Amino acid sequence: GFVGRISPEKGLEDVAELSARTGRVVRVWGMMQDEAYWHRVAIDHPDARLDYRGFLPTDELQAEIGRCAALVMTPKWVEAFGNVAIEAMATGVPVLTYDRGGPAEIVVDGVTGFVVPADDVDALADAVERIDQIDRAMCRQRVDAEYSSLAMADRVVTWVDEVVDASNAVVDA
């Protein structure tokens, strides 16, 4: 599956090329921001099997993502974080992403998905063929350990403790 705005910076043309090469249907969810771009991708990749599902409420989207073999992220720019990667992994879905920006930092290559060189559709296609090697439970465990509310709260507490300790060291000096 693919989740994101339908716009050039999300790299949907690479997803279409991936679909054409692998023969797999890729479900696409997101706001249709650039309809001309969507049509151009379809024309340029006539063998792609993209199934546009529209923009869904979060709970429905998570249920849909959970039925995917993988989530594909092909950003053409440096994404700051990549909430979609967290949402997919929380449902046990591995993520295939380019080595660019936040998603590449979230995905543990070979454990919760695959991180491939940016703009390398051949590497994405290879990753698709290996997707069954990923243990979906590990995807969920990674999100629980690193991105759950409890994990984030623990990091904030640690940070505050470090700031207080540093402040005390300055006062004592």
Language model features with spans:
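A short alpha->beta transition loop at the rim of the catalytic pocket in nucleotide-sugar-dependent
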Residues: 69, 92
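Nucleotide-sugar-dependent
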Residues: 75-82, 104-105
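Short hydrophobic beta-strand element within catalytic cores of glycosyltransferases
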Residues: 94-97
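Conserved donor-binding/catalytic core segment of Leloir-type glycosyltransferases
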Residues: 1-29
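A charged, aromatic-enriched C-terminal amphipathic alpha-helix characteristic of glycosyltransferases
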Residues: 133-169
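Short alpha-helical segment that forms part of, or immediately flanks, the ligand-binding pocket
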Residues: 62, 85-90, 104-105, 111
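Conserved acidic donor-binding segment of nucleotide-sugar-dependent glycosyltransferases
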Residues: 108-110, 114-120, 128-133
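Nucleotide-activated donor-binding/catalytic signature segment of Leloir-type glycosyltransferases, i.e.
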Residues: 28-30, 38-59, 63
